Amino acid sequence: MSSTILTNVTTYPIKSTQGISLNNALVKETGLELDRHFVITDLNGKFITGRTKSALVLVNSNITATGLILNAPGMPELRITYNNFSNKYQNVQVWNDEISAQHCSNEIDQWFSMYLNFSCRFYYLGEHSHREVKGLDHKLSFADGYPLLLISEASLEALNAKLEHPVAMAQFRPNLVVSQCLEFAEDGWHKIRIGEVVFEIVKPCSRCIFTTVNEITGKRNKQKEPLSTLKKFRQAKDKEIYFGQNLIALNEGSIKVGDKVEIISKHPPQEYSVSN
């Protein structure tokens, strides 16, 4: 088999919204530049995601030199400019973590509140914000638990072969997609090099109901697919369902689509039960 290569790089500036495909990217300690650097919360500061507000996956963002441009169904275009952010910081909650986050503006709050029909606020991972990966001295953005997620195309193909209706890779929201490897080969990788960056695979990624939300329609699958099928062959002893690998970057540097994936070291893969 040919060398494994990086085939897609995606950053998700706003947690739970559409990703942006990149040809090349700067990788920092927190992951891809800008990835999950914005979060939407309720009025108490608790984070909101596509798990409960699936329409978020239909929010499209484009990166500009001064901020972001947002579009969503039925909404006017919104321009987000860093220079217009407030200087106010407030504690927000992402899972069990409290993070001091920079409030952006009332205008952006109102835009998302109107779109979701739910009162909410919009925050940025500002220069005074700090969060770390649980158990590691490693900076983290508003991502669920780790800075980066990697999945191979072969693994998705193996899943889709078991599904009546195949799903797109976007439904799993990876940052890095690789090809030209065996299905679930990434389960056994420990350290890899892509471009200028060495990555450590920390753990497999536990999957939730968000994977059942169609990235085009914004609707949740009534049969809870692909999660129901994944459960049949990717459930571990802890009863969690895993698909993809969580990574941390061991140094800053650039990566680009087409880069070779060098497998530096391996470790024993997680074991999974198989059911009919």
Briefly describe each language-model feature range.
Residues 1-276:
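Metal-cofactor-dependent catalytic cores
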